[in-house]
Structure formats: C-alpha cells, structure tokens
C-alpha cells in the first residue's frame, strides 16, 4: 500500500502523478494520501487542516486506487512520520507500506523524530524532478547501511509544479488551471484561499517545534 504524505497546501497534479507513477512502479493496489495535521517543519502559516483534507478528497475522488486518511489530522499535535506509519500499520497490519515523499525532504531524514524506526515500518520512495541528485552526505552514508530496496528514488516530470508556486499564483490572482484538478481550483476560489489578508480565517499558525517530522 502506498502512503503519500504531505501538507497538500494545495494538492496539485505533481502529487497525483507521483502517486500514480509509484503505484504503477511497485504494483500497489492502493495509495493513501495523508494530509499532515500540524507539520512542525513548516516555518509559515498553513491552511486549516479541514481545507487541506477536503482539497485532497476532491482531487483524488476520481481514481479508485486513491483514498484519503485523517490519521494525522485527527491525532492532534505535531505530525511525525513515525506516528503516521505506526497508525497505518495498526489499521492495515497485513499491508507492506511504501511511504512516498519528496526526495529533498528525505535528505534530512536523519533529523526526523525516531528516524531509526522508520525503515522498519515502511519502504521509502523519494520522488524528484528529473536530474535531481541526493547529495546530502548523511543520507548518502545511510544508504550504504540500508537494504537495497529500503529507499528508492523516482523521477517525476510533473514535479516541476509546486504548492509554493500555486499559492503565489493565487495570491497574485493568476490562473491555476492545468496545475491542479479543476475541482480544486474551484475550491480554492470559493474559499478564497491564498489571497493574502482575506484568507486569515482559513489559516492556522504553526511554528517550528523542537522535534522532527515531515
């Protein structure tokens, strides 16, 4: 079972294509998208969890292999990957988990809370733009100690799209069409997300906590 972790603020085609490609590559029956509750690593305001959850549900609804989990949102407190995987293991004890995230995030995996346990809970898939190289010396050293299939890097051309760019375009009233599903574009517009001062009520403030996570 694939596990697609992220803030999804907002979700876009890069996320969806990455999940689809990983599912095909590893012959996965299902990919569960898990919007983070309170992502401790984000040094900016993030949209309220319910907005991010609903956008993810809307974006994935048409693919029968995709589903969305609330485990991180409903747990409360900062979101740590080890808790995400432990909860999903409890819910799906017979499934082998493939945790998918950005390759750039994996470069700092040794700073995540309980990182030593992570590779016992799941296989990791780092998705990246074509040409990306995992250069962090700590993760490069770690790779030599892991089983061959513990961590795989996969190039995804659609990852040239980023949530940061989508937010900036919305703030500048620039078009979001063809960067994300039409239904998500309409949701962003209807709820007035990412439009500067007008969306203060749609935001929740998170600060960098003294812990580790994704």
UniProtKB/Swiss-Prot annotation:
GO molecular function: ATP binding; nicotinate-nucleotide adenylyltransferase activity
Enzyme Commission designation: 2.7.7.18
InterPro entries per record: Cyt_trans-like, NadD/NMNAT, Rossmann-like_a/b/a_fold
Keywords: ATP-binding, NAD, Nucleotide-binding, Nucleotidyltransferase, Pyridine nucleotide biosynthesis, Transferase
Gene3D superfamilies: HUPs (3.40.50.620)
Annotated transmembrane regions: none
UniProt enzyme class: transferase
Reactions mediated catalytically: nicotinate beta-D-ribonucleotide + ATP + H(+) = deamido-NAD(+) + diphosphate
UniProt keyword Transcription regulation, yes or no: no
The keyword Nucleotide-binding is assigned to this record: yes
Biological process annotations from GO: NAD biosynthetic process
Function according to Swiss-Prot or TrEMBL: Catalyzes the reversible adenylation of nicotinate mononucleotide (NaMN) to nicotinic acid adenine dinucleotide (NaAD).
Sequence similarity: Belongs to the NadD family.
The protein's name in its UniProt record: Probable nicotinate-nucleotide adenylyltransferase
The species this protein was found in: Mycobacterium bovis (strain ATCC BAA-935 / AF2122/97)
């Amino acid at each position: 079972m694939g596990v697609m972790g992220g803030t999804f603020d907002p979700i876009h085609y890069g996320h969806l294509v990455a999940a689809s490609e990983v599912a095909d590559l590893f012959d996965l029956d299902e990919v569960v998208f898990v919007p983070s509750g309170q992502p401790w690593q984000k040094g900016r305001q993030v949209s309220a969890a319910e907005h991010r959850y609903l956008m993810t549900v809307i974006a994935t609804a048409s693919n029968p292999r995709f589903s969305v989990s609330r485990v991180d949102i409903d747990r409360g407190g900062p979101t740590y990957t080890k808790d995400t995987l432990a909860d999903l293991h409890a819910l799906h004890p017979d499934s082998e988990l493939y945790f998918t995230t950005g390759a750039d995030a994996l470069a700092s995996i040794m700073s995540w809370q309980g990182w030593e346990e992570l590779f016992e809970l799941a296989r990791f898939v780092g998705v990246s733009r074509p040409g990306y190289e995992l250069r962090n010396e700590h993760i490069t050293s770690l790779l030599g100690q892991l089983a061959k299939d513990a961590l795989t890097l996969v190039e995804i051309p659609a990852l040239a799209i980023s949530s940061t760019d989508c937010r900036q375009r919305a703030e500048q009233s620039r078009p979001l069409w063809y960067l994300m599903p039409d239904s998500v574009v309409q949701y962003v517009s209807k709820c007035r997300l990412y439009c500067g001062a007008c969306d203060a009520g749609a935001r929740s403030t998170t600060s960098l906590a003294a812990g580790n996570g994704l």
